[in-house]
Amino acid sequence: MAAKLDDFMQWPEIEALEYGECSRPQDVLGARMADRSHVLVTAYFPEVDSVAVRVAGAKKEYKMEEADRQGYYGVLIPGRKIPEYVFMVEKKGKRREVPDAYAMDSLIDGMDMEKFINGCHDTIYEKLGAHPMTRDGVEGTYFAVWAPNARAVSVVGDFNQWREDTHPMIKREPAGIYELFVPGVGKGDLYKFSIYQSTGNRVLKADPFANYAELRPATASVVWDLTKYSWKDEKWLARRSKWNCEKEPVLVYEVALGAFKKPKIAGREERDCFYTYKEMAPLLCEYCEKMGYTHVELMPVMEHPFDGSWGYQVTGYYAPTARYGTPDDFAYFVDYMHQHDIGVILDWVPAHFPKDQHGLARFDGTCLFEHLDPRQGEHPHWGTLIYNYGRNEVVNFLTANAMYWIRQFHVDGIRMDAVASMLYLDYGKQDGEWVANMYGGNENLEAIAFLQHINDCIHKEKSGVMTIAEESTAWPQVTGDVSDGGLGFDFKWNMGWMNDYLEYIQTDPLFRKGRHGMLTMSMLYQYSEDFMLVLSHDEVVHGKGSMYGKIPGDHQDKLSTLRLTYGFMAAHPGKKLLFMGQEFGQIREWSEERELDWQLLDPVDGQESGHEKLRQFVSYLNVFYQAHPALYVNDTKPSGFQWLSTLDADNSVIVFLRKCKDETLLITCNFTPVYHEKFKVGVPFAGKYKEILNSDAVEFGGGGHVNPRVKNSKREKWDGKPNSIEIKLAPLSVQVFQCTKVAVKRKKA
């Protein structure tokens, strides 16, 4: 028998197997017909005492012979077809039953591979990665990874003592996907892929499609079952599917989950203390409900190794970061927010990725996800790598990732980070550091096609999910229809308004009249895109100071100007986003290492603090905004806005209307600390003008310069308008008047 068994030994392949260099383990492991009357069963079990084959339905076991001294076993079993069987493995007097990992059929079929190669498999995350399942009555985990240029790939983990020779994976062509079902591996088990590169090097890589990962600084992937969470947000999803975000009120609260609030944990520094997703859900939800926000936008929650990157250097695109708990915990967070009518937008980073050894960089020994040429593949500013958007599989990886967060975790929006860096080949680069496109230009044609494709994919589902671009240049048609050559986003961050306004507001009020045009500039291009006004985290870090810290003047001036700022922002066309802490005048610049300065809201000498009154104003303003359709229904239509006064630079005052079918609002903004007892405002029609919001009201911490009585217009021309009203114009304030037309009686001839 020994001599006969030896006739079937493929020694070169067996040696490659034992060195972890075998890409076709199915040729030397598992069962196959040796001849018409014998089945050859082989297995690799290093460092065990004996192995036998137990055939299903048979009482007899067939002891396997160790063909060499490295743990390669074989046996010839009489039979005309391959039976069902298991291995009986003995070590130190203990026997255990082990199903054969190489007896299972492939789960990657030709259609899967064709779609992936063509970049159109938007559920590829259901195939690649780690998926606990039961196959033929055997519980285990199915692993699959894309590594076309690797010589061999093994899945390693605690379940096989991290040995690369124990579970070599089977390569499936033409896609270059390695797969293997490993019996006995389940939820919570650690794993990585051991990749034998064409250079002869061996590296351990985290799974690009892993659903969970170890808490940093550890880097292993974790097997997780995403099918067990039971969602309860059906009503929210049904409403969202009918939602027209262009015509709805959108108030976004931008949040860094790990620094909103932090628990006190004995023996840990504050920077290492985090609430879990489940713990954070009611805390954040209650606050957003109290404040009147419609959505939260989470700075990246995808797995990342470095806290100081704030999540913008991602290594685990399919894994909610373990800093705050498990994938089920994150699902609970989103579900909880939805059940309380708050949407969840995710920051997403398709522009670049870090060079960490366990991540995507040179994944299979080649530049698989990135460009080979560093002029195309590296971001000099960030020290990161740029995706190769010209490779179908890379586009598929990213597109499927966005769809994964939408489908698997029910998120309501995707905010794409650093879009400008994707659009321009020379972004952040000097001459000689970039490669022109086929036409000699600096436009990244492949990135453009990718952005159009991903927006198309998201919007074709008609689920009501928003896409938002952080795009800092004047690239045309960011929110234009893909069919018309646009990129297809729902909204673009209005960086122009933000930069102009922040420069203006940091100017001493005495000199603001010289920069008056900065207040009105944004309306010159307002209708070129569908905009979202933002005061984001980027503006309160890196020495820029908090919103409170930017503003000149004393404490009261700062708080008054913040009320004015947020009121002007609410009245200006465009959806809104504000970074956490700025709504109550956080004094210190933001840091991811500590929670917000909530103590600023505590009473001072038994009285409400100015910061608490500012918070109350923002809460009132948010509710006010949602109650007045004129402030949001026609954000993208010129008919929804009208200037009344743009030239009063000497007083640093602007006046405008916001309009919709059912209401007209008049807004005044005074950007100096000067109070005007009788300020004349030209109005376009005769009517009654009732003040319904004044940021200088005493209850908000102001001086109380309000207009308690309705103002009746007079037939007196002012600012080119046929009628006018006279109001108290409060210092550093925004005031909103409800306008009601009154029929003018004609004089008898």
Segments from the language model and where they lie:
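Short, flexible loop/turn elements at secondary-structure junctions
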Residues: 68, 147-149, 173, 184, ...
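Substrate-binding/active-site clefts of carbohydrate-active enzymes
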Residues: 214, 234-247, 256-443
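Non-transmembrane alpha-helical segments in soluble domains
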Residues: 285, 334, 402-406, 455, ...
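Carbohydrate-interacting/catalytic domains
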Residues: 1-249, 278-288, 556-559, 570-578, ...
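Conserved alpha/beta catalytic core and glycan-binding cleft of carbohydrate-active enzymes
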Residues: 410-412, 430-594, 626-696, 703-704
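A short acidic, glycine-rich active-site loop
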Residues: 319-323, 438-445, 554-556, 600-612
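Short acidic/polar active-site loop segments enriched in Thr and Asp
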Residues: 49, 151, 294-296, 412, ...
